[in-house]
């Protein structure tokens, strides 16, 4: 029959063995990884060592096994070298050395370092024990001084040897025996008795089972249990029958069952012997194979009952030993074997048919027992001397009906024992199942009382067994039914998908183990209907172990209640991997029981025990955290895990605690699984010797410096060019300085206007122009400097702190006006060094120069990739903002043209023109200046200037071009400040226009002359002005006018010299409109010009 097997997977109990044989985890010892050649990092430290040295476990983990952090001023340098040498050669070291605690207090320590091997014989760990011998050392030193003064010599050596022997006894105790060397003993052949290893091996130990140990779930044991079950039922039937019906009256009948009784007794005795050699399942769910533990367990549980039930009373009859009748009653003790049936009832209740069979058997057994009692009552009344009773007893009535009455004072005659038993059983069964039929009835008082009890018991049994068999099965065995249903589903799944035997075994063991832990109860499903308040209290009680960590001391009760809802319970079997390298970390794990190891490339990086926390340092903005190593279970482990998704939700609800949690978790983690963290540890260990030379001797402390990037100093021009190439956003000053290097302002402005005409430059306004050269253009323009930038030597410093979060970058356009010295100094964005995790700035030894160079190259490449990614994101955002600005300006222009009211044209007085335009000025141009602007707006009581337009030519005296039109300082007014000069053609005299005050906008429209010319009449040229500030000290705009060629065809090229000879002297002003608004500065400054050569009659938006 199927039985719960228990936990059989091989476990690596190395940590438990060390802790147990060291008298608990409070002993002073550490374990270090012997497979990492540089530094031999510590993978486990006991609580006693932390108390001795004054360091926390998180501060000791991953430090060097040589314990340089305990060295001080008076530490013997020769012993330091010997420790390093013994670690390199992987040999044992013992010695007395002066160490220093965290607070700087010195103490003498007896240090013993022993290598630990695995099953292959390779040294994988170092076990270092520490014993404080300060008191002994001081006492011995004082005694030595006294002896030196009296005898002139020292005897301290013997005391040192005794102290060393006392400390070595602890390590020898780990092997399970003390090495005793006795003289006068014969040497035993090593081939027969091989010495056990001095220390336990670091490996997964298989269950060692002797061939004389019987598995409790084996097939033989299952068949034996069925045989013992039948023997138990035999005892339950025959013992009451022999006591009540036979007694000492019919020894022949008794002797007929003697053989079967002796056989049953022999079976019980053999069962006792087998129980001393049968495994059992402990309370923790593990299978116990040790013979001594099995014996102790059996003796303290069922041995006494089984021994009494197996006493061979029937052997007394076999050897013709006369016994009194009371000895027969001792056989009723065998009924205690039924208690064993109750113990194994859960094993037999796996199927409904077995359950029904057992219930019916128990019902029949109860009827048998009550029949025996019913016969004893009739027999006692028959033997009574009262004549009034024996005549009405049920046996007397039965004898009359069977025509075998009693006679001779009721001692002779009467029905046979067989007939009496059948009649008694018939009466009890009819009474238990119904009210009886009356053919066998109770006549005396005793019989009536027994009949009443039988009816009550029958009603109860009938209701429980026959009336509610289905309800009994569902209520009593529903959990087992669910267990076997799921087990059957699991086996069907394995059979359908043809899973291998190893995977099948793992699945079955995991299912059985998890079922034994939670008994098939889904806590989430069970608690989902409870209110949140009650559910939070329940989960806080269930997860109180992890919530009592120092990590959650600063959390409020509400935060803990919310967090407890996101804590789950997990289980891991020996050899199972909790996490694989490169997996996405989904939770933070807390080890409740068992031990685990952290592996990378088959090397042990850390050993985790009860109370350890494993995960990664967090950031609020983290999306995916990849693990850097494997986490494998050594024993059966119970875990509690905090789901990261729920954790981030809770931290979002409690921001005052979130920052504290992010800071504290990196100190409370026993091992950090964040990808990239282990390279920092190995690098720190590999350079430990170099760093220790720079640090002063004394107690080691953790260095906590902010990460930084230190670059080699170069020329100032190279720094400016490299800074410009870091980001797609440039300042106005850098653009102007670059234009001065490449050419004149006129050439640079001409290039910008060509780009504007083609629509490739995303300007925000006609007077807000910021040159933004792409990185590609920059590299093409200056390849030598770009090459020098790649060859730049980066020196990187690493902090022991965890990685910081990525800084937020807000893309924006930096105008040159933000800094008064923008034309002299280049403004760039400073990307913080917190987003980069560099290595310590150290000078590696010559043997490690290649490793350091390769590591720096990798870090530099990662940094470049991050910067390029940021540049692309900022560029994309800038383009989107520019496109949005252009769309908004187009919409505002349309609204202004629609909503602005029309007014009659206002003409200005004539103003003499000092000169006629030359061919170089025959290009339409709009210029702004501080003294004589063409279009000028000044916020807050400023004046709006405008000028008329003639022949499509606007010009301003170049000598009057000044600083930015945004200047608000007052300047001396003169008549020329409120007028606009323009260059007329031929004999036309220009006019100057009046000033329009404050909240007005003016719209001017000019059309081509009405006189006959060789030039085709143009469409109207319009200019509108709205009121925002200017962002450029100088902006020029080129317009292309259509012209007529000599053959008379219309062209759309630029105006040539011969086509302008017949240009009229003036253009007629078609109309002038002005509109008012509340605040002119709310409108963007823009100039919109439209000519015939624009496709689809669309305006050129600047």
From Swiss-Prot:
cNMP-binding domain: annotated segments: 551-668
UniProt keyword annotation of tRNA processing present: no
InterPro entries: cNMP-bd_dom, cNMP-bd_dom_sf, Ion_trans_dom, K_chnl_volt-dep_EAG/ELK/ERG, K_chnl_volt-dep_ELK, KCNH_animal-type, PAC, PAS
Motif placement: Selectivity filter: 434-439
Keywords (A to Z) from UniProt: Glycoprotein, Ion channel, Ion transport, Membrane, Potassium, Potassium channel, Potassium transport, Transmembrane, Transmembrane helix, Transport, Voltage-gated channel
Homology family: Belongs to the potassium channel family. H (Eag) (TC 1.A.1.20) subfamily. Kv12.1/KCNH8 sub-subfamily.
Name recorded for this polypeptide: Voltage-gated delayed rectifier potassium channel KCNH8
Taxonomic placement: Eukaryota, Metazoa, Chordata, Craniata, Vertebrata
